[in-house]
Amino acid sequence: MNTQILILTLVAAIHTNADKICLGHHAVSNGTKVNTLTERGVEVVNATETVERRTIPRICTKGKKAIDLGQCGLLGIITGPPQCDQFLEFTADLIIERREGNDVCYPGKFVNEEALRQILRESGGINKETTGFTYSGIRTNGVTSACRRSGSSFYAEMKWLLSNTDNAAFPQMTKSYKNTRNEPALIVWGIHHSGSATEQTKLYGSGNKLITVGSSNYQQSFVPSPGARPQVNGQSGRIDFHWLILNPNDTVTFSFNGAFVAPDRVSFFKGKSMGIQSEVPVDTNCEGECYHNGGTITSNLPFQNVNSRAVGKCPRYVKQKSLLLATGMKNVPEIPKKREKRGLFGAIAGFIENGWEGLVDGWYGFRHQNAQGEGTAADYKSTQSAIDQITGKLNRLIEKTNQQFELIDNEFTEVEKQIGNVINWTRDSITEVWSYNADLLVAMENQHTIDLTDSEMNKLYERVRRQLRENAEEDCTGCFEIFHKCDDDCMASIRNNTYDHSTYREEAMQNRVKIDPVKLSSGYKDVILWFSLGASCFLLLAIAMGLVFMCVKNGNMRCTICI
């Protein structure tokens, strides 16, 4: 019997660690959560607050011509009660009103006062010109104990016209003023309502009193209403102040027969200014452009949550206390367990798995290993490209939201309360709209930032893949296994986009042939082992059956079947 010995040899190819280059992005252990159009609470590496919540509790006036009215009410600068004597003419770009300020001395009110306040706040200061009115047959020196200087006096810019003697008839008079300047003029006059009919007769004589005022675009008649009223400043009478803006070359005419408080000077405005009502102190050592009743907002942010009635060059008021603007890429913190399990390249390519917390000098970068060791380097080109597109996002938001705000008070007269309610409702509605708009604007910018940074990562990955071509193989974790020896200079050429794949092509192709093209991962090893075992058993069984068949054929073995 011929004996044949068959030897089955199992050859295992062991692949040593190849040179590798991996791509990844910067990550931090604790990022900042922002909202995007599609998702809330997305963690990013960097974010900037866009809502200002801080304020300086002072009115900063450095570099400004500021005027603090103190006890003088804003409207008093036109009529001239004693407390406003030093403010009858001035120049300012910031007018500060105080709660203690009073517009009048003899009790009364300004008609349509809110509109007049707004005009004066924007005036930039005032200079004045005499009306040139002259009178005969009457007294022009009416005074009252309610307006005291060294003794009884009156409004500095007005003339209280009285009968020549008590109870004497007041003559019918007509006075006109023509505005000869090339700018509008503000004219104020008063209607005196006596405390009683007896007092009116004493001051202006008997009979009905009528005052008529007219210009090219204004016509109004006034009838005084004498009567008992509660005393204010020792007076039961009242003066209603009326006003009009007289255009250049226009003329206003006053016709009256008593109870008339005549203008002595008219007012002209100087440039532009801003007014603020506040009780906080003035600080000449700090600068500001945005003011509210609690102080100054000094911020370059596009939004603020300090005061809805801030005035000046202010951030938009929104209800949100925080709106974070992403200024960095999406953060996927490095996972320590993966790093321990897979070594240097365990936490590779953040756009696939997670980021690199050690990559601090760039947003994107490379890690490599070769015979000379391991290394990490930032990719400045892709980093700068992303930064260039993100830089200026805050400024663009500011450009979209910046607006000069003006103060509109809630101190409306009875006649103006409905207008005041409309203004307040409108202000609240605008706040609601801008709060929504701010949320949407920031979410859109955040979405764009995250998409942009992902795009730059993909561009870098594609750049490397196109360079290496068949000289390397992707491993689906952001790494490329290189099939040739790649020293530090070679790695640098890949990073710098100067790699020449043809130089290494022959070596790479030879090495690819030696390497089993099927890369076994732990998930497939058991399947291959069972397949190998089954194939070996089948081969042994086939050999045994072949030997039996040969023996039977040669007569060396007989098979008897019994039935």
From Swiss-Prot:
Gene responsible for this protein: HA
Protein name as catalogued: Hemagglutinin
Principal location class: virion
Glycoprotein among keywords: yes
Taxonomic source organism: Influenza A virus (strain A/Starling/Victoria/5156/1985 H7N7)
One protein family per Pfam: Hemagglutinin
Leader sequence segment: 1-18
Keyword entries, A-Z: Clathrin- and caveolin-independent endocytosis of virus by host, Clathrin-mediated endocytosis of virus by host, Disulfide bond, Fusion of virus membrane with host endosomal membrane, Fusion of virus membrane with host membrane, Glycoprotein, Hemagglutinin, Host cell membrane, Host membrane, Host-virus interaction, Lipoprotein, Membrane, Palmitate, Signal, Transmembrane, Transmembrane helix, Viral attachment to host cell, Viral envelope protein, Viral penetration into host cytoplasm, Virion, Virus endocytosis by host, Virus entry into host cell
Subunit structure and binding partners: Homotrimer of disulfide-linked HA1-HA2.
Note: The extent of infection into host organism is determined by HA. Influenza viruses bud from the apical surface of polarized epithelial cells (e.g. bronchial epithelial cells) into lumen of lungs and are therefore usually pneumotropic. The reason is that HA is cleaved by tryptase clara which is restricted to lungs. However, HAs of H5 and H7 pantropic avian viruses subtypes can be cleaved by furin and subtilisin-type enzymes, allowing the virus to grow in other organs than lungs.
InterPro entries: Capsid_hemagglutn, Hemagglutn_HA1_a/b_dom_sf, Hemagglutn_influenz_A, Hemagglutn_influenz_A/B
Membrane topology, record value: Single-pass type I membrane protein
